[in-house]
């Protein structure tokens, strides 16, 4: 496993999101947003999208579809030590999730998973940077570790700036 050091400074935060999804209005606390994306702490209303995301990544054998442990897995996402965020386009379309592992360390790790139809569109570097800037504003860190888990992800992270922005 390889890690890249990525350095960031300040970000935006503190808005509330209201959007129409499937004819239903949702009010969500926004962790950070810009003119393209909205990042919110994951919530119960994200469960179906999150499960589908993991089905796309892991196939039908994902633990989120396993009758014996799906509720336990979801509880871990909501209440675990890692912070999980849902990523939306500004129009409210769900893109995927971001995970901040070891959030209290000086070197937190950021992971990202996107729906198949949202991959290879330049979303990952933008939302990872957006999340990192906001996290840095909350608490100064030495650097963020970006985990590369798939060959496809390599292109996403190799294009990342490795200097201070």
What is each PLM-predicted segment?
Residues 7-14, 18, 23-49, 53, ...:
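Acyl-donor (CoA/ACP) binding surface of acyl/acetyltransferases
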Residues 12-16, 58, 72, 82, ...:
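Amphipathic alpha-helical interaction segments
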Residues 55-76:
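Conserved GNAT-fold acetyl-CoA-binding loop/helix
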Residues 73-78, 155-159:
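Short amphipathic alpha-helical patches
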Residues 75-87, 96:
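A short helix-loop-beta-strand connector motif used in the catalytic cores of GNAT acetyltransferases and
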